[in-house]
Regions:
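A sequence/structural signal for flexible, mid-protein segments enriched
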Residues: 17-356
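Sec-dependent signal peptide hydrophobic core
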Residues: 5-9
């Protein structure tokens, strides 16, 4: 059954420069800048678009300057390959490298098509304290149906003496090493994707805190694996385990974790990325070794990032009904434009999985 979701009033009170959506009818052209930066990552990415009236369009080019603690750390423009793809997706990714860690202050300045925007000062949060991560295959049984899932457990400890906010996601990585009988070198190809996370009051009260309260009867009616939407991130606060330990328990459908299902995709990627078969003849590899792993990522984030991700996840949820539900305000923090950018600090554990 549909439950009326009461979304936290904090969304309306979040201390940001603006909010999304804004009055499209009266707004002139503004840069839309979105993305998350990751402490310690080799490459950072933000997406740039142009919003005017009720439409969003791509930009021809964009330049991003990144300042860390007041010092220019990187200047980058969009790659030519990204420009070609941006014409279809109406957002242009700009990639750059910059090094920052806990406590550093990051500011981005963005220029595109004659428009300018910037972020406020973004303080890099602490990395979550994660002691142990584990997983096992199991079956979730309900009244009339069952589902094979990969069940994850994450043991972590809250940082003492402060309010903390977190985000959680999975990254599946399938790697294929292709060999050819004509003697050409082996080619490794990697596919990364973000499986949906599911949980209920039957598994984890921390991740469910502030979401819909579902019973087993509700889960029989709704789609268990998708009822919380298909957003990339789950979010949670330390409200239920402040200054102490916690164990997160969540599931992901086993259908995402069969490497054989990815082999055809990997070969298509091989053709597109490396020009194999560009002469009209596609030599099928004599062998391909497929390996599968999943990375569990727990991110430390700001309160604003927590509210932003929670809002996006809520409006994409199968349980969200704009007629029956309180309206959701999506925070924004871009100065001179719209959108949201913030910094995450990640604790990650990669787990190798069997092929079947």
């Amino acid at each position: 059954m549909k439950r009326i979701l009461i979304f936290t009033a904090l969304l309306a009170a979040v201390a940001c420069e603006n909010e999304i959506p804004y009055d499209f009818g009266e707004a002139g052209p503004k840069l839309m800048v979105t993305g998350f930066l990751y402490a310690g990552a080799a490459e950072q990415t933000v997406n740039v678009s142009l919003s005017e009236g009720g439409t969003v369009s791509g930009v021809g080019d964009a330049t991003v300057r990144c300042y860390v603690n007041g010092t220019l750390a990187a200047t980058a423009s969009a790659h030519s390959d990204d420009k070609a793809r941006a014409a279809h997706y109406h957002q242009l990714p700009v990639r750059f490298s910059a090094d920052f860690d806990t406590g550093d202050v990051v500011v981005l300045e963005v220029e595109a098509d004659g428009y300018k925007a910037s972020t406020p000062e973004l303080t890099v949060p602490h990395k979550p304290i994660v002691e142990k991560t584990d997983t096992t295959y199991t079956t979730v049984t309900h009244t009339d149906w069952s589902e094979e899932v990969l069940r994850f457990t994450v043991d972590m400890t809250d940082r003492k003496g402060e309010d903390n906010w977190y985000a959680l996601n999975l990254v599946k990585e399938v790697t294929g090493t292709f060999s050819f009988e004509d003697g050409r070198p082996d080619i490794p190809v990697v596919r990364r994707s973000y499986p949906t996370i599911s949980h209920s009051s039957l598994t984890d009260p921390i991740l469910l805190d502030g979401n819909m309260a579902l019973t087993d009867v509700d889960l029989d009616i709704m789609d268990y694996m998708d009822y919380l939407g298909d957003g990339r991130f789950e979010t949670f606060s330390d409200q239920l385990f402040r200054d102490g330990p916690a164990r997160l328990v969540f599931d992901s459908s086993r259908q995402y974790y069969y490497p054989g299902a990815d082999s055809d995709y990997l070969f298509d990627l091989l053709i597109r990325s490396y020009g194999v078969g560009s002469d009209g003849f596609v030599p099928w590899p004599t062998s391909d070794e497929i390996s599968l792993s999943v990375e569990v990522q727990v991110h430390g984030c700001s309160k604003d990032a927590y509210l932003y991700l929670r809002a996006l996840h809520t409006v994409r949820s199968n349980g969200y009904n704009p007629v029956l539900t309180e309206p959701v305000t999506i925070p924004g923090n871009i100065i001179g434009g719209i959108g949201f950018v913030d910094v995450l600090n990640t604790s990650a554990v990669r787990i190798g999985l069997p092929e079947n």
